[in-house]
């Protein structure tokens, strides 16, 4: 069947869809040029490069987080989970009969596991797509995978992904998970379809008040640590009414950009910093 005029998609699809002819690279590049390349975060553009052109239009992004029970950490005298060592220590201290020390992602066919695992690897300085592969990263890679085993061992049995980690954190059954900032509204009791079950009031913000967030954490081989981020793009397709698709994106990314981001402000961080007159 015919493709939509515009697809809102993640970074991982930009180059494969460009190479497969699904995206109209020329049309998307035209929009980026019209909006002004200097108005975009350079990293968002560089990752969407197909040859000399930008294959899709950057829209927004978010940074993954370690979400943790700040109150339990403080009560146990634990440091915040800013590195492998602190997380491992917290798992040992806070695991119990009714408390899993961590809820990791273990369902291998879920994209969520790729996100969490890559975050853990980057935290320890491991880059899977680095030129030359992982040959020179052997020690750091081994340490990262051993740490992930610690996270998995502290987790409940079964195949786990975002759904279980959120549900168990909301129920007060784990002190730590890795999640996106999209958890923030439901954490505060503002989403009917995914309320906290921490207490009897599904609209309570008690759990939110007891929660802390870490965006950058580190491993023993990378003391400065790293964050993991996801970027989303608009892609005009090969089947599109090109002129109308361009108009839609131009509006959504310019005078309508605040409205675009307000769809989910907790997880839609701007990647366009200004406009052509004030980049």
Please provide the spans of the model-predicted regions:
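Loop/turn elements at helix/coil->beta-strand transitions in domains of secreted/extracellular proteins
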Residues: 2-5, 53-54, 96-101, 172-175, ...
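Glycine-centered hinge/linker elements that transmit conformational signals in sensory
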Residues: 91-95, 131-159, 202, 207-212, ...
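Extracytoplasmic/periplasmic solute-binding protein
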Residues: 50-59, 64, 86-133, 140, ...
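Short helix-initiation/N-cap motifs at beta->coil->alpha
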Residues: 1, 84-89, 158-171
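Beta->alpha turn/N-cap motifs
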Residues: 9-13, 162, 179-184, 232
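Hinge/lid segment of periplasmic solute-binding proteins
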Residues: 9-63, 88, 113-116, 202-217
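C-terminal lobe and pocket-closing loops
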Residues: 186-195, 203-205, 219-279
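Extracytoplasmic "Venus flytrap"/periplasmic binding protein-like
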Residues: 1-40, 71, 75-82, 174-176, ...
